[in-house]
């Protein structure tokens, strides 16, 4: 029996880790939304790809939860984020880490996550996607050598096909909606754009069972 392909999905926090205010987190709390982009993508993968195991690491949730429950902790948010990522990498041992980045203010956190993952295990494929990644793909590929691929526009169709490529060694040239680096020049290359999803009905229900959904209002607000 083939080994399951392990996929870890996470998102680049919108909060600046250097400016994270523990008092605000404790008294008022930060905005904390359940990561529907990650759960929807996970649902698509589980429906379309066989023999795959997915876990979600919502960094904002775990950071806010930790500081709510450990008021006297002197740990910095940036250090906690690194510890959370390393712990999950060591425990789950993913083959692929997908980083969702919806907003431009998360830009620096993409690099932080990618660097932590690759330093822990350089064989892991680190990919990113989302609104910001789509429009800043060149900047991302130019500035962070630890990002292997950028998914452009919606990944609900492209990401499952990419995982099939990794599992079954299908033709990389057949994949659409990706940006990567030329092996020689290192210049960004874009494949043909994947068609936009017009009919949303076939998109699976988000995989809410992969996150502690009921706890989100306890540690933040939305």
Predicted regions: what they are:
Residues 33, 201-222:
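Radical SAM [4Fe-4S] cluster-binding motif and immediate context
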Residues 1-2, 88:
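Short boundary motifs at domain starts and secondary-structure transition points
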């Amino acid at each position: 029996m083939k080994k399951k392909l392990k996929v870890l999905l996470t998102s680049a926090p919108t909060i600046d880790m250097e400016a994270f205010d523990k008092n605000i987190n404790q008294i008022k709390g930060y905005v904390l939304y359940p990561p529907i982009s990650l759960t929807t993508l996970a649902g698509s993968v589980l429906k379309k790809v066989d023999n795959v195991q997915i876990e979600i690491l919502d960094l904002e949730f775990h950071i806010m939860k930790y500081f709510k429950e450990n008021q006297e902790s002197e740990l910095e948010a940036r250090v906690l984020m690194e510890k959370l990522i390393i712990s999950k990498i060591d425990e789950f041992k993913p083959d692929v880490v997908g980083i969702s980045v919806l907003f431009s203010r998360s830009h620096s956190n993409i690099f932080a996550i990618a660097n932590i993952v690759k330093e822990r295990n350089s064989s892991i494929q680190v990919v990113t996607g989302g609104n910001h990644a789509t429009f800043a793909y060149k900047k991302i590929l130019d500035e962070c050598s630890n990002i292997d691929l950028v998914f452009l526009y919606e990944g609900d169709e492209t990401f499952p096909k990419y995982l099939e490529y990794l599992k079954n060694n299908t033709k990389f040239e057949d994949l659409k909606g990706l940006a990567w680096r030329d092996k020689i020049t290192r210049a960004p290359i874009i494949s043909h754009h994947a068609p936009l999803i017009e009919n949303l009905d076939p998109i699976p229900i988000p995989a809410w069972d992969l996150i502690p959904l009921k706890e989100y209002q306890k540690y933040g607000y939305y």
